[in-house]
Amino acid sequence: MLEPICASEALAERGKAVVWDVMQWGRPARAFALRFDGQVVAYLNRCAHVPTELDWQPGEFLDDSRQWILCSIHGAAYHPADGRCVGGPCGRGRLTPLEVGEADGRVHWYPTKELQPAFPD
């Protein structure tokens, strides 16, 4: 089952992310999608270091250079392409990915047993 996220044009290259509500193992959580090097990537909005949301402003996840996803609390840095920690207190951690796709001008994600829509139809 595909779940819509947004129109493709809503995700500018290395721009602001789209954030939406999900359920992780039955508990409320947030996820985000952004475009990096032409690909749409999506992750659970939770730092691998401390379970807190990453964005420093709504939808703003990338650092000033627009190269890294940066945690607003402790500065943990993650590579946008694969979510792996590249610096800071996240050690060998990584962000939890969501499988996403893009077709016909729309971005969508594939729910899993772990991550489900917050508001199913």
What positions do the PLM features span?
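N-terminal pre-ligand scaffold of iron-sulfur
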Residues: 1-65, 79-80, 94-121
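Short cysteine clusters
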Residues: 47, 71-74
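Short cysteine/histidine-rich metal-coordination sites, predominantly Zn2+-binding motifs
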Residues: 61-71, 85-93
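Short beta-strand His + acidic residue motifs that chelate non-heme Fe in jelly-roll/DSBH
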Residues: 78-79, 87
